[in-house]
């Protein structure tokens, strides 16, 4: 039985549109293309779907207004282009959505907005309020102020985090390809489109190697986004943006594109927030016993199971937990700073106070502040 019924039963969509589908070969906004996207989104909204749009295009629009022929390499110049272009992008959307009497809202997010629990909850409340008011939020990364070190990396990731934030049913990533293929269609004429796969399928890992089918065209980031969205129970459709009326067809469950469906129970809201933390301050390496305790028993991480500590972090920072082979097992908020963690690693809880002169917690990371990768 097809999993497309997951889509037809869904009412809350996050739609991500990349620059290639909004601009005229990178030479500024393509108003005709934008009009077509707005028409489709307005049609979904009229049918009762809740839609949040994650839109690229600000940098390209700014470059055109500034008279730049090629994308600048310097981050401050990219940020300047984004600052100029963001207003143009929203003006273009406002002009088109007015044709359908639809209200829109501009929302700019950066990593700090989602890494702070309070700001995360505020963003969620704002987006929910906008949707209740029948306003379509248009979201982009706040390129003007963000630094390279804390960028989301791409709008695929941002869209997945937004899907988690609002507990969306479907994340729809529009691309310049028809979807995901089992091999590179540019090299293999017999390459077949993958219609449906579990978001956590190991087969996708094998394909996502440097020489695999997903190693080109940004598909690796789309798989990562699908897996992140799956944590809140959202399924992801990766589909070609050149298909006529693609969004209504996706909503109708047509067999187009690739559906990477969530086949696990959604994790709790706090753990969704933890899973979305992209910036970690350190790494703790675990022994096999600790790995088993986290994976199989869902317990807290005790110092005795830690073999090594790297990085510099303070209490409350995000750290990554890895096994002896370097594979990420989990991530969580640490109860001790890096210096103290090194002193107590490999030691039983009963020795913490002797080693540190104090003991605030038995656990290095409590299970409530830990999420499996």
From Swiss-Prot:
Q: Which HAMAP family match?
A: ProB (MF_00456)
How would you classify this enzyme at the top EC level?
Answer: transferase
Give GO cellular component annotations, separated by semicolons. cytosol
User: Which GO terms fall under biological process for this protein?
Assistant: L-proline biosynthetic process
Record's function text: Catalyzes the transfer of a phosphate group to glutamate to form L-glutamate 5-phosphate.
Q: Which residues bind substrate?
A: 56, 143, 155
- Superkingdom of this protein's organism: Bacteria
Gene name? proB
Q: Which organism is it from?
A: Teredinibacter turnerae (strain ATCC 39867 / T7901)
What's its catalytic activity?
A: L-glutamate + ATP = L-glutamyl 5-phosphate + ADP
Q: What is its main location?
A: cytoplasm
Q: Which CDD domains match?
A: AAK_G5K_ProB, PUA_G5K
Where does it reside? Cytoplasm
- One MF annotation (Gene Ontology) recorded for this entry: ATP binding
The cross-references to SUPFAM superfamilies, in alphabetical order and at most eight, read: Carbamate kinase-like (SSF53633), PUA domain-like (SSF88697)
Q: What is this protein called?
A: Glutamate 5-kinase
